[in-house]
Amino acid sequence: MNNQPQGTNSVPNSIGNIFSNIGTPSFNMAQIPQQLYQSLTPQQLQMIQQRHQQLLRSRLQQQQQQQQQTSPPPQTHQSPPPPPQQSQPIANQSATSTPPPPPAPHNLHPQIGQVPLAPAPINLPPQIAQLPLATQQQVLNKLRQQAIAKNNPQVVNAITVAQQQVQRQIEQQKGQQTAQTQLEQQRQLLVQQQQQQQLRNQIQRQQQQQFRHHVQIQQQQQKQQQQQQQHQQQQQQQQQQQQQQQQQQQQQQQQQQQQQQQQQQQQQGQIPQSQQVPQVRSMSGQPPTNVQPTIGQLPQLPKLNLPKYQTIQYDPPETKLPYPTYWSDKKADTDTLLYEQIIQRDKINKYSLIRETNGYDPFSIYGFSNKEYISRLWHTLKYYQDLKNTRMKSITSTSQKIPSASIWGNGYSGYGNGITNTTTRVIPQVEVGNRKHYLEDKLKVYKQAMNETSEQLVPIRLEFDQDRDRFFLRDTLLWNKNDKLIKIEDFVDDMLRDYRFEDATREQHIDTICQSIQEQIQEFQGNPYIELNQDRLGGDDLRIRIKLDIVVGQNQLIDQFEWDISNSDNCPEEFAESMCQELELPGEFVTAIAHSIREQVHMYHKSLALLGYNFDGSAIEDDDIRSRMLPTITLDDVYRPAAESKIFTPNLLQISAAELERLDKDKDRDTRRKRRQGRSNRRGMLALSGTSASNTSMNGVHNTVAAGNASSLPPGEILLPDIADIPRTFRTPVPSTLMPGGVDVGPSVESYELRNTTTYKSRPDRPKPVSPPCYIIDHIPGHSLLLSIKLPGKVNTKEEFAAAPNDTSSGTNAMLPSPESLKTKLNSNIRAGVTIPSIPNPIANHTVTNSPNPTLQPVIPGGAASKSVPTPSLPIAPPVAPHDSEATLLTNSNNGSSNNNTQNT
């Protein structure tokens, strides 16, 4: 076969070598030399590309025909066993209709090689033939598994041949796709090269045009500059001529004025000498010109002739600019620049005035103007005034025990909150002293997050009966097996505090609950599809039926749906959250639904792992599990029958207290029945044979059995989960009025009434003041009586008082002791261990000492004799620190009489 186009004999050998592989996948336009490629026109390139595509298509068609012709009929000694009755006539017809193979052609392309022999094609049923090839392969694989399970080798062989045929079709599609992609790539390369060449040509043209345009602009600018210079020179010459003419005219006018003045003076008479001005001669001797008339005159500007204008009643015709920068290249004159400056200044002033009055809209109402600043201050001041008045009113009402609105507003007055429009108070939800403070260690959290590859959520079910376990608790939760931050004991303790268990009961049952959780964690079988680390899209279509029967409070949710246990991308938590959002269910149902799904999926995973299933998409040998697996979905089974629509519809029932009690009793009865039967599955125990025991841990899937259950089983037998028994979920209501379905701790939420009671309590009497044991009284002459306290056993004091009447001094001063006697008293008191303050001479009349039996000696004014009077014992004052104050004990006297001996203590 000649792949070269016609007319190539006239082309040189170099060009013929370039196009020698045209029509093959290895041909590319990039192999054409650059010089030859630039010389070709776009039409020639398009013709080459079309010719290449035609030759390539014809080559592919010939290859396909040769493959079909070279396929020989099936031989007798290698033919498989006869397929079923439906597939036998199809195979016979295809075998008889195939002609004998023609001789293989010798002029094939060397890259094609020998084509493998293919069996006769098999016509698939229309239901399977309508599906895509990948789906056909999966359906045939399922049918083959079922045929293997039913031990039908004929059907297995027929399906195997059909699978090979589908596989060949898939490979042919891939080959066609690769060829098409190569063609598209070549087309794209051609288009890109053409676009690049066009861009290059355009850039060259633009550069040439720009260069020509630039040269023209320079020439025009030079011409304009020359014209402007000539025009300026002409204007300067004209101005000089005009100035000379003006000067000549001024001189002539001045001369005429002088002549007229002289003539007038001659007519009036001779000019007086005082008024005559002598002529000043210049240094050269010539008379100077008259300068006085031109001193106060300004030089006159030349008159400019205004240009003539013409009024046009129509728009001038539009003309095309020679180049875009025609007007901007011209130099603006002074008038234009000044006019633009004035316009710009007025525009800026206008905008500034608008901003000062209205402000900047994007920032606030009035922007950054004075009005905005004042209004903002006014609003802030008003807010603080209102806040102050509200708080002061609330504080005053609270102090007067008058119910008033809270400072913080009305708050929440919805479900479970009651009324908050009362006196401000803070009520914690849980007592602080009853809970432990949990201090989170950020380093542990970081290490846990770094070391954890994935989470293994274990479904935990807690069911404790009052008769058997001496306490009642039902709850379900998910526990992360890989989590090492929280201990099970701490979690159980916090959970029991939520359920308001007493301290003694809580400490008694913590170990029981922790042991139950640990046993369920040990019995947990991980997801084998995740542990095998198989890279797959989707699953093996192992669908089961999930049944939900959840009771939370007085609400019961009943539903069922299909779930693929082989697809590890299915997330029960996301499904539960989406379902509760659609049905508007509270958060208690989210965790309950996720737990129920994981629990039922775990039962199937564990049963298959214990039976030795390889989890590779093969057929399941166990009849009971295989019967519970749902069949493969086909085109006829896409829509669910109308009779099953009621079953696969969620039902949320409102149950009464009596119905809830009945369900609770049924649950207890089922629990006791299962406990009596030992939770045996549908076949009881599974005997481990030599073959099954070796397959229990294949592919790295480790199967774990609880130690407690394994110890009670006979040797060689294991306990399988009962997949027929779907547990019903009961949640113990949490004692809370905030969570829906909880148990009200106090009275009903709707039973609150606002009642105001006022009680008046009398103020208690003020306590009577207690007089101190000792007073310090100032000495008032004529109104007080000085007393001298004598210490027992002191002789010096008696002698001093005995010698007092013999003193020449009279009155009160005569009875005062001398300073020397005071020194002796102080010394004696210091020896006795009593501290006495220093007393000045003119004020101090006596000292106070701590004596068990002091004696009072009255001093009578007027020189009366002194007499010792026994007095009762006085309370002893504590010792005081020394200071410069007066410390005397005085008694008031009535008009100086000696009969009144009243003491004032």
Swiss-Prot record:
InterPro entries: SNF5. Its main location: nucleus. Component of the SWI/SNF global transcription activator complex. The 1.14 MDa SWI/SNF complex is composed of 11 different subunits: one copy each of SWI1, SNF2/SWI2, SNF5, SNF12/SWP73, ARP7/SWP61, ARP9/SWP59; two copies each of SWI3, SNF6, SNF11, SWP82; and three copies of TAF14/SWP29. Residues 281-295, 689-698, 847-856 have a biased composition (Polar residues). It holds the Pfam family SNF5. Residues 50-119, 270-299, 664-698, 847-905 are annotated as: Disordered. Keywords: Activator, Nucleus, Phosphoprotein, Transcription, Transcription regulation. Residues 672-682 have a biased composition (Basic residues). The modification Phosphoserine is found at residue 818. GO terms for cellular component: chromatin; cytosol; nuclear chromosome; nucleus; SWI/SNF complex. Present with 217 molecules/cell in log phase SD medium. This is SWI/SNF chromatin-remodeling complex subunit SNF5. Residues 71-86, 872-881 have a biased composition (Pro residues). Involved in transcriptional activation. Component of the SWI/SNF complex, an ATP-dependent chromatin-remodeling complex, which is required for the positive and negative regulation of gene expression of a large number of genes. It changes chromatin structure by altering DNA-histone contacts within a nucleosome, leading eventually to a change in nucleosome position, thus facilitating or repressing binding of gene-specific transcription factors. The keyword Transcription regulation applies. Belongs to the SNF5 family. One of its GO terms (molecular function) is RNA polymerase II-specific DNA-binding transcription factor binding. GO terms for biological process: carbon catabolite activation of transcription; chromatin remodeling; double-strand break repair via homologous recombination; positive regulation of invasive growth in response to glucose limitation; positive regulation of transcription by RNA polymerase II; regulation of transcription by RNA polymerase II. Residues 50-70, 270-280, 891-905 have a biased composition (Low complexity). It is found in: Nucleus. The keyword Transmembrane helix does not apply. The gene is SNF5.
